[in-house]
Curated annotation (Swiss-Prot):
Keywords: ANK repeat, Host cytoplasm, Repeat, Secreted, Transferase, Virulence
Every Fido domain range: 155-289
ANK repeats: 391-420, 424-453, 464-494, 498-527, 554-583, 588-617, 658-687, 691-720, 725-767, 771-800
Protein name (record): Phosphocholine transferase AnkX
Pfam families in the record: Ank_2, AnkX_ins
InterPro entries from the UniProt entry: AnkX_ins, Ankyrin_rpt, Ankyrin_rpt-contain_sf, Fido, Fido-like_dom_sf, T4SS_AnkX
Gene that encodes it: ankX
Class of the enzyme per the UniProt entry, highest EC level: transferase
Enzyme Commission code: 2.7.1.-
Amino acid sequence: MVKIMPNLPGLYFLQAYPSEEIWRLFVDGRFWSKENGWRGYESREPGCLNAALESLCSIALQVEKSGEEFELSVDLIKRIHKKCGKKVEELQEKNPGELRTDEPVSFGIPAGRASIKGIEEFLSLVFLTEGGAEFGPGKAGPFGPRFDKNYFKNLNPEQIPDLAKQIYFDMCKYGHSNTNHFYLAVMKNVDVYLEKITQSYNKEIKTAETLDEKLKIIVKHIRMYEVLHPFRDANGRTFVNNLLNILLMQQGLPPATFYEPNVFDLYSAEELVVVVKEAIFNTVEIIEQSKRKTPITLYGYHSSLEEQTKFRDMLDSPSYEKIKHMDFSDLNPEKLHLKTQKCLSSLNEQYPLHRGAIYLSDPGEIKLLLSNRNESQINQQIEQGAPPIYVGKTPAHLAVISGNMAMLDELIAKKADLSLQDYDGKTALHYAAECGNMQIMGKILKVVLSQEDAIKVLNIKDNHGKTAFHYAAEFGTPELISALTTTEVIQINEPDNSGSSAITLAYKNHKLKIFDELLNSGADISDELLDAIWARKDKETLGKIIAKNEKILLNKEAFRIAISLGSVSLVKKFLRAGVDIDIPLTKDKATPLMLSINSGNPKLVSYLLKKGANTRLTDTSGNSVLHYVFYSKAENREALANIITEKDKKLINQPNANGNPPLYNAVVVNDLKMATILLEMGARVDFEDRLGNNILHSAMRRCDLPIILDIVKKDSTLLHKRNSERRNPFHQALHEMHTFPSSKETEEIHFMNLSDLLLKEGVDLNKKDIKGKTILDIALSKQYFHLCVKLMKAGAHTNISSPSKFLKNSDANSILERPFKFKNDLKKELDNNPLIAMAQINDLYVQIKNNRIRTPTGYAPKEGVSFFKGKSNDAKAHDEVLSVLKELYDSKLTEMLGNLPGEGLEEIKRSQKFFDGELKLLIKNQDISRKVDKKSIQEAVGTSLKLKW
């Protein structure tokens, strides 16, 4: 056995934590009953529990070193985060162990995870304002929240107390658990602030004398780490589940088991001390119950022997095993327990009835606790700032959540009001239905049904528009449903705020026995339920619904789903019931035949054709049934196309409303096989859509080379044709391509291959599109350097019409007498992109040298030097123009190189590689570059690049 050293005495408690329950340290208590203990959490990110446990234990063992005084460091924090992400696929792309640089990280915070004092302290954190954080009301978006207001902007410290109250009340108006306030974490100097917070902790913890002072310092800094949010993901696991517990164990305290750990953003330090103490108390309870061999039922969840066995089998943490075998004989366990009890003693004074509802089980103790309590105390709802499980709830709510039968009996005896709604709008009946405890439901129903307002109470809706019946359907048992329906006052078809009825919720939550019970009770079948059945591709359930309710055969949505599921037997039933075989089934007026093709079932397609389905109908976009072949899976397309064209060959060249025939669809999905089949069937390639695009305009961007070659063989003139934006197919494809670093090389090779077709066919490379861009302009903007060089060698130019006109209209006097103005005016005629501008300058230089551009206006190319007079003003101005072009080229080159990233070794390597492998190739192929003195050292962002020409 390994002997324990003094750095982390609280490891004694971690060792005592029952192995089969250790997952509770990482899974929020609010999820235990709903998600079957650890299973829901683990299913979202497989491997996360083992990773988090190994991180906690391995770091704890590292901290626990002989003769070494522990001091927190940024390096330790990074190691915790890296270990939390080990073997967790979901986190690998988030760079475990690496800090954010400028990546935005945001999340919503509901009122249930905030307090007035917490918001006040949050707004007072100076580093949030300095670092560019944002906080305020808004709406969630795909790339982060859209703020209606940012409270950090122009924040006046004197206004913070009143502002904090107003913010909390605004959050509550939207709902206790609903989110309408968002936080965008610090964007600048994350590493600097992380180091400052760490040093602040190391300094302050040394000055603390009492355990409460130390606890406050710990939670204050954990809170700062949390709001800094230095990592892209798993910040909670890193700081709350790992670092916090290490710091607690360093003080000789047990690790924390939270009901709701996500309160470290907008709770105050004092409030967080209570939250953490409550979580420590949970750990003590779990350990004590395990020692007494009594079932652990904290927050109403008890894991079965089967679940415990499955978890132990899954458990894989070598460091945890080491801790389980450590020798604690040098420690004084009694002293540790007394220290913990003293720390937690302050909890006894707070929320006695509410805490009793969760933690007391002895009927005698419960009776004594409630003996002298009045009605207001029994029905008290705790206000903001308390541990989250208490806020807004009465003792009755908590007794139901915890499955505390003895407490519920005593509360009922004391006439507790079971119709009171918490801040989420839930009554005790809602929680009984959600927990699925038939005994508790029976007790509450008995009380409620004896009241005059029973109908009203039974149908009370929470903030989500759900009654207790909705929760019973979603989380309960058939027995619960039966108990509620037999009251004969439950509205079984009432929808919640999202439009879901009880039967829909049961189906979505895989409560199939409850679904059957409700179906047999005559529950209505909504379109939303049918959509859920379609999403699950559940033919069996649709068949079950039809068998129970034949009226559904007249429901158009049900027919659409039967078609989409590809079920011939179900479709037959609808047609026999008199449904029109060509009835439009979607808002786009897709027919049953179209949707059957979409489903990819040749048997169903053949059946509908046999029954007389019309092949000539189109949807609102003019798509025929042959167009719909390409909405099906690739493996089904050939069979479907053969069935349809055998019935109606004219569909092969029938265009849709945009002018695109089915061949276009084959090109869009890059299906070489089907494109070849359609071409062999006689598909034409000379069509144009409404924007003048031919088939190659689509093919060149989307398709592999073989399809394009097949089309070009059919008609090579398509390469020349320009659309309404004046682009030929190559030009258009280049314009539409969105370049990404990961695929840039592959994209450029594709265009290099395509350019061979242009050069072979003699396509004009210098036509300008509607925006005045040539092919070379666009290739430069995409930084396809090898393609640019190839095009330049073939005679491609940038668009120099504007600077060329300027030079042709410039006279010698304007050039020679006002050289600075001339240079600036010429610079304005160039493109803003330095790469394109360099190429424009090169084209101007070459054309001037070759006398294709005459500048100044009076310059004659063969003008010589007079022996007596020397060079004329026009000749001098001509030379000045060439000199200015060289200066501008040099400045644009400097600008281009100066913009290259150079912060960090990897960025410097990438910039150097970019220059050596790509940019240098372009520059060396520009004639003017040979006339410019190029530097061997160039300043880039944050570094100097070595340039070897």
